[in-house]
């Protein structure tokens, strides 16, 4: 069998060689091996070793060290500004609160260390000359696109409930599925996610939502994710009979997240959009009514959804910019778009072009998750027309006081008394320009000033 060769960064290779030259065994381990086998560039290169923490510290005493994890066997060594974690082979004792082991026992063999890890694809090690050490079928699961716990999945999730969300995130990131036993154990244990800190839950969900397989993962494992965000549960199976929809609320939500086009969005914008899509219809179940024709209606779900989204995001301790951005989008995601230059300019004044571009992206994804009817195609064309005109007006139009051809000094020179009256007059002039009643030229504005 051909032995895989992983190209290690120079510093990671030097660390391995230094540990081995001192008589210790050492391997790169975990995600760097997984990503290398997938042809991806690893973000971190972690090392496991038989060296005890004090031995590692002594060996690299002339380097900058990070010792915050030394009690649990991890010593960070900083080389050329980049930290490398070197962790002693260990086995975890009994876990408390579904998150942290009571004790950590250092061991001398790699096999014992790999057996404590979460998933088979993360339980592989590598060293030059030895190749990949795979004791749990990680390579097979990589080839088959499977997320599988090492050993008994129920035991792994009982030890650390956050592993449930890590399984979801890896499935979304790699576009894999959970093996049946792992999926069943995750569902059985999902209520224990309520014991995990809000910050940890937020970080895992944030990574999941930004991943290429987010929509498919949400569709498959919504009941598991409801352990982290209980408001999801009523959305699952909540029907939407009528001509607009072909999915229940949850499957529509998953499809919308999967349909998001994040091209052109910066990092913050992409995160805001992912969370807005995730929560945009969260209030549909409590707002649902069914008309005499059997069609479902969800009146008021925009505003109620914004309230629920704010509650959820604050509970998860999301960043303030994300809370405000996502809640703002949820609040108007289903509202009609402005028509006509005056209305579009006023929307630019009120919301700004960045928000409106995000709103268009959310509306596209929302519509793409509807039934492919003539009405939906027409509404998508309306969004496209709005986006094109809004983009043009954002470049060429006047929608802020700063863009007016006159300023406060010009008004005072024209006889307006200094103070609040200057601001009031500027706002009136801006409105006149946005409504097309006055051209945005100095002479026209000063002439209009006399009539205000």
Language-model features, listed with the residues they occupy:
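Catalytic cores of the polymerase beta-like nucleotidyltransferase superfamily
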Residues: 1-452
